[in-house]
């Protein structure tokens, strides 16, 4: 089980950053399923413990930040832009899709709670059998990410450069990263 090396886009490209995070979501969700198989064959050895630690770190830190990026910044901006576009049917469709994926966040958080408890035990060296929720988590999270990309992120063209810069700045702040006020994308936001 190997970690996925990845160079992420900068916060000046917030949609690309969110999509890159989805690649990591897919990777770590799959890895949780692979870990269950690995444990059956090799037990909770050092590699299994390290893998559990990495999955925990990703979904405990990056996962909640990603949902906050969407729920606090991207989704409200897209809702407002869709409503302002004057295309009421398209705005209703986009707002409905946003409502649905936000509901999925709650379901995914519940699945994560079960998977998390199991991973914490594996990290401590206990070769516990994976809960049924691991397979559901490993399938549902990547499907959710694909849905967001196909039904929501594709509408990022509704946003202005200033709105995207504001989203990127808020993503940076959420992660404790310093924004350069001389950067025109940041200064205009």
Region annotations inferred by a language model:
Residues 1-189:
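Small-residue-biased structural context
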């Amino acid at each position: 089980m190997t970690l996925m090396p990845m160079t992420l886009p900068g916060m000046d490209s917030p949609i690309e950053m969110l999509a890159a995070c989805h690649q990591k979501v897919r990777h770590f969700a799959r890895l949780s399923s692979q870990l269950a198989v690995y444990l059956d064959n090799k037990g909770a050895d050092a590699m299994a413990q390290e893998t559990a630690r990495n999955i925990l770190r990703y979904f405990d830190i990056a996962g909640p930040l990603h949902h906050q990026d969407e729920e606090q910044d991207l989704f409200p901006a897209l809702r407002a832009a869709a409503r302002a576009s004057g295309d009421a049917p398209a705005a209703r469709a986009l707002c409905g899709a946003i409502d649905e994926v936000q509901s999925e966040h709650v379901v995914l958080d519940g699945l994560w709670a079960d998977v998390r408890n199991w991973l914490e035990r594996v990290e401590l060296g206990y070769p516990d059998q994976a809960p049924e929720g691991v397979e559901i988590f490993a399938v549902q999270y990547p499907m959710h990410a694909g849905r967001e990309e196909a039904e929501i992120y594709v509408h990022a063209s509704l946003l202005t450069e200033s709105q995207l810069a504001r989203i990127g700045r808020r993503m940076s702040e959420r992660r404790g990263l310093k924004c350069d006020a001389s950067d025109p994308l940041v200064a205009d936001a």
